[in-house]
From Swiss-Prot:
Biological function: Cysteine protease that plays a key role in cytoplasm to vacuole transport (Cvt) and autophagy by mediating both proteolytic activation and delipidation of ATG8. Required for selective autophagic degradation of the nucleus (nucleophagy) as well as for mitophagy which contributes to regulate mitochondrial quantity and quality by eliminating the mitochondria to a basal level to fulfill cellular energy requirements and preventing excess ROS production. The protease activity is required for proteolytic activation of ATG8: cleaves the C-terminal amino acid of ATG8 to reveal a C-terminal glycine.
Listed Pfam families: Peptidase_C54
EC number, UniProt record: 3.4.22.-
Catalysed reactions, semicolon-separated: [protein]-C-terminal L-amino acid-glycyl-phosphatidylethanolamide + H2O = [protein]-C-terminal L-amino acid-glycine + a 1,2-diacyl-sn-glycero-3-phosphoethanolamine
InterPro entries: Papain-like_cys_pep_sf (IPR038765), Peptidase_C54 (IPR005078), Peptidase_C54_cat (IPR046792)
MF-aspect GO terms: cysteine-type endopeptidase activity; protein-phosphatidylethanolamide deconjugating activity
Residue stretches of biased makeup (Polar residues): 474-492
Protein family according to the UniProt entry: Belongs to the peptidase C54 family.
Protein name: Probable cysteine protease ATG4
Gene name as annotated: ATG4
UniProt keyword annotation of Cytoplasm present: yes
Cellular location(s): Cytoplasm; Nucleus; Preautophagosomal structure
Active site (catalytic residues): 151, 330, 332
């Protein structure tokens, strides 16, 4: 943005602000402070866009000449600028912050809606989103925007929406070139209104129930997101709605052949597909380098539906990679809720960003779409051949060691996840997850970081006398119906 453009932009913006300021003052809202924050940080937002790929403003490097992978489809020897790739990315469904939707009541002991006003200055169109939802910002009792707290919900919606698009429209679907009523039906399922099965409202509703008890305005983690997706998909499945997708959640990344087979052969009605969700933590502060290749390998498989994750307190939807750079869609772009004559285009974008796998936060939710038994066998074979270090396959769930094979080693560098079966209130769901503070870790044995399996030699040579390796890990397990979970890997 040039200095002249910035000046003109600032002048017009200040005129808009002055028109609204009198009304805000009458209503007792301190708009002056908010506006000061918006104008002083606007240049920061421009600088934050430096990683964004645009058609007209790019200098191609040797790194960008490598092949590009987008949800299992590989483009060799084609510039990332190529129109074919851009159209493929544009066809992916993009979920973002929204403003001005039907109010969601706050909890008395939960976050306050106005406490998130200041976070608007860190989003890419703070001015328009602020004024479009101006009256909503003055409502102390309801949320009318998810700015500042809903990014994990949005990336989870994106993962699920692209799952449905892949399942019912195929990998070759091109939005804009191929117009399909089914595409619009999929988007309708994610509208920000209570009647839409996968709306923000319904994500919050099912997450507010036991055991998660997430309140409106609170951030979701991968576990809360995966359980919310399961509950919502179960509701659609049981109502014989469009797209009967069964969800399997595996915190330990263990998959059991007999359970997958049973789901495809005994459930009535037969599911159109199984969505495997892996809410995992692959390191401490960043993804352990031992998992870098495995993360990329999963995105390269045709069963991949992406990853919801990113950086601490900022979730992105990862749909592919180029070299060691992950490509993602950013939900931190507030859009006003519009009427349906123009809404569908707002769920697609030409803009995408990149993040080095070295800088990726270790906490994420990985999505895998399995269409039938043969598809599962193909997926299993691909992971086995590549020696994928994230997923583990077992022929049967009855004799599998759900604690993993790591109990003989110390677990020092991970958050401990405790799963208590007594907390189960809905039999089809797995149960609450209680994080133990790091202050308590020195007195606890049994920390499990999946990377320790490959660091065992170092671990053996650097024994810590504060840990008693002979003491067994005391973690209760739960396996309910077709869903199975484990604490064998470190999880958020």
């Amino acid at each position: 943005m040039s200095n002249r453009d910035s000046s003109e932009h600032g002048d017009s913006s200040n005129k808009i602000a002055s028109n609204e300021c009198n009304e805000a003052t009458k209503l007792g809202f301190n708009f002056t402070q908010l506006w000061s924050q918006i104008t002083t940080t606007y240049s920061l937002i421009d600088r934050n866009d430096s990683n964004m790929f645009n058609r007209d403003e790019r200098v191609e490097s040797e790194q960008e000449k490598k092949s590009v992978v987008i949800l299992g489809k590989k483009y060799d020897d084609i510039s990332v600028d190529d129109g074919v790739i851009e159209q493929d990315i544009y066809s992916k469904i993009w979920l973002t912050y929204r403003t001005g939707f039907e109010p969601i009541a706050k909890c008395l002991d939960g976050p306050q809606p106005l406490s998130f006003v200041q976070s608007m200055v860190f989003n890419r169109n703070p001015i328009s989103s602020t004024f479009n939802n101006f009256h909503g910002l003055l409502d102390n009792d309801n949320f009318t925007t998810d700015v500042g707290w809903g990014c994990m919900i949005r990336t989870s919606q994106a993962l699920l929406a692209n799952t449905y698009q892949l399942l019912f429209l195929g990998r070759g679907f091109s939005y804009g070139r191929d117009r399909s009523p089914r595409h619009d039906e999929i988007i309708d399922m994610f509208m920000d209104e209570p009647r839409a099965p996968f709306s923000l409202h319904n994500f919050i509703k099912v997450a507010s129930e036991s055991p998660l008890k997430v309140k409106p305005g609170q951030w979701f983690g991968p576990n809360a997101a995966s359980l919310s997706i399961k509950r919502l998909c179960d509701n659609v499945y049981e109502s014989n709605g469009t797209g009967r997708v069964k969800v399997v959640i595996s915190e330990s990344s263990n998959l059991y052949d007999d359970i997958i087979t049973q789901m495809f052969t005994t459930l009535n009605p037969v599911p159109d597909a199984i969505l495997v969700l892996l809410p995992v933590r692959l390191g401490i502060d960043k993804v352990n380098p031992l998992y870098h290749a495995s993360v990329l390998e999963l995105l390269a498989l045709r069963q991949s539906v992406g990853i919801a994750g990113g950086k601490p307190s900022s979730s992105f939807y990862f749909f592919g990679y180029k070299g060691n750079d992950l490509l993602y869609l950013d939900p931190h772009y507030p859009q006003f809720v519009r009427n349906k004559t123009s809404v569908y285009d707002t769920y697609h974008t030409n803009s995408y960003q990149k993040l080095s796998v070295d800088d990726m936060d270790p906490s994420m939710m990985i999505g895998i779409l399995i269409k039938d038994i043969n598809d599962y066998e193909d997926f299993k074979s691909s992971c086995t051949k590549s020696s994928n270090k994230i997923l583990h396959f077992h022929p049967t769930s009855e004799k599998a060691d759900r604690r993993g094979s790591l109990s003989e080693f110390k677990r020092k560098n991970s958050e401990f996840v405790c799963i208590e079966s007594k907390d189960v209130q809905r039999r089809e769901d797995f149960i609450t997850i209680d994080n133990v503070s790091r202050d308590d870790l020195n007195n606890m044995e049994g920390f499990i970081d999946m990377a320790d399996e490959f660091d065992s030699e170092i671990d053996q040579n650097n024994k810590d006398d504060n840990f008693d390796d002979d003491e067994p890990v005391n973690v209760s397990q739960t396996s309910i119906g077709e869903e199975y979970t484990s604490t064998a890997g470190s999880r958020p």
